[in-house]
């Protein structure tokens, strides 16, 4: 996590502004191909293709935000630091890719055998307050109580 607390612009407001971006229509045209690439990557167990596609999509999502009217800048210096670190790790041979939703925090995916090295590297970055580890779930589960 590079930032804790509410975003400067809510996701709802960001969605409303997305259509003001001159790149919005083109992004919509690209989505079917991207979905196909994600599906094929999952079916083929091609982690590198999956990672590259979701990273591409995240960058385009933020391109739309940054080019909306008025522009939305979710990224922080910490976001850029993590994005660069992930790219460097990949160049060093660690298979990791980044993705982001609307906000400053970067989500990083990797294979289980790379997790410890990835977490060590991310935790060493000055802008990273802490790392939340996640894993693949066993599937949906009905709960008797709400989580909150």
Model regions and ranges:
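C-terminal nucleotide
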Residues: 1-148
């Amino acid at each position: 996590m590079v930032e804790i607390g509410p975003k400067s612009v809510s996701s709802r407001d960001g969605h409303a502004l997305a259509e003001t971006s001159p790149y919005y229509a083109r992004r919509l045209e690209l989505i079917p191909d991207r979905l196909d690439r994600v599906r094929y990557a999952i079916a083929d167990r091609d982690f590198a293709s999956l990672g590259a596609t979701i990273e591409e999509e995240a960058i385009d999502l933020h391109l739309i935000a940054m080019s909306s009217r008025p522009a939305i800048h979710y990224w922080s210096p910490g976001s850029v630091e993590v994005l660069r670190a992930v790219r460097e790790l990949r160049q060093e041979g660690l298979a990791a890719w980044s993705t982001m939703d609307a906000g400053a925090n970067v989500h990083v995916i990797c294979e289980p055998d790379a997790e410890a090295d990835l977490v060590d590297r991310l935790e060493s970055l000055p802008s990273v307050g802490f790392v939340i580890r996640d894993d693949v779930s066993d599937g949906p589960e009905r709960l008797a109580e709400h989580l909150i």
